[in-house]
Amino acid sequence: YKNTSDTPRVHVTVVLPTRHEEAAIVDTIRSIPKGNWCEKIDFLIVDGNSTDRTRELAEKEGANVYLEPRKGYGRAYKTGFSMAPGEIIVTMDADCTYPGEEVPNLVKKLIDEDLKWITCDRLKRAEEGSMPGLHGFGNWVLSKTASILYWYGIHDSQSGMWVFRKSIFEDEDNADHLFAIKIALFELEKIKFKSLYN
């Protein structure tokens, strides 16, 4: 998305759960391009009562910070998803373990292919590191629909990088079930997904 004519009119919110991430929070936020690849992007930090400078540094980078006193990744994400103002939500760990520079490509893929949910596999990406450009990246991304169709083995069960439409949580029939899926993933459970890549 180099031209304004190509810029999708979408609002993207990046939700980052944090606890004692002062060493990496700034680099994590800055790793995501702030150019004209979307109409608006903002950052929501859901902090688990860090005692270091995580919240201070995030606020200096322009992020919105919410202190979540209840413990757990699942709780942090549930809070973040409900508070996120964007119609597209991106999740990442705040420790620079994910390629923030690829977020525009992920959002583009979500929109262009009319997907509901994308999850990313760090291990597969590492194995295919010799593949150039978007070809290698395309093989790294495991694109998912929001429908739960059959058991699928996720290579990176602890992946925290997701891109999805917030609307899937606004459907009363889906909300509780999909929250349970997200929380279960972070509890290292096997999840039922349909994959567009095999």
Locations of regions flagged by a protein language model:
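Cell-envelope/extracellular polymer assembly enzymes that use nucleotide-activated donors
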Residues: H11-T13, D42
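A conserved acidic beta->alpha catalytic loop
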Residues: D47-R55
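Acceptor/aglycone-binding surface of glycosyltransferases and processive sugar-polymer synthases
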Residues: P69-S82, G100-H177
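The conserved acidic donor/metal-binding loop of glycosyltransferases
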Residues: D93-T97
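Catalytic donor-sugar/metal-binding loop of nucleotide-sugar-dependent glycosyltransferases
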Residues: G153, F186-N198
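Acidic donor-binding loop at a coil-to-helix junction in glycosyltransferase catalytic cores
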Residues: L178-L185
